[in-house]
Amino acid sequence: MNSPAAYSVSKNSLFHLTKWQASYFAPHVNVNMISPGGILRNQNKRFRKKYINSTPLQRMCYEEDVVFAILFLLSDLSNYITGQNLIIDGGYTIL
């Protein structure tokens, strides 16, 4: 997706769909979404350096970070969480 507007609209649509599903399926099903930041893959060194310098935790997201979030949401530890967007971006979006 090359358009920031299209990305923003699609992400916002998913968030509102999540909230609707959470209210519709409650109290029997909890519905949440995950929004990971930049996941470390094969990005070039320049991109990685720029991204890392823009993130308070000073690193990119590892695949395991997303897996741990999913496991948390699947566990009883999150049984009172529904309709939420769990942002896993090392603080990138707070700056």
Roles of regions detected by a PLM:
Residues 71, 82-95:
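Short C-terminal tail/terminal secondary-structure segment
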Residues 30-40, 74, 87-89:
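Conserved SDR Rossmann-fold cofactor-binding beta-strand/turn motif
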Residues 2, 6, 33-55:
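A glycine/serine/threonine-rich, flexible loop-to-helix segment
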Residues 55-66, 77:
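A conserved structural motif in NAD(P)-dependent oxidoreductases
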Residues 10, 18:
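Active-site helix of classical SDR
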Residues 26-30, 81-83:
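Short, small/polar-rich loop/turn modules that mediate ligand/substrate recognition or access, typified
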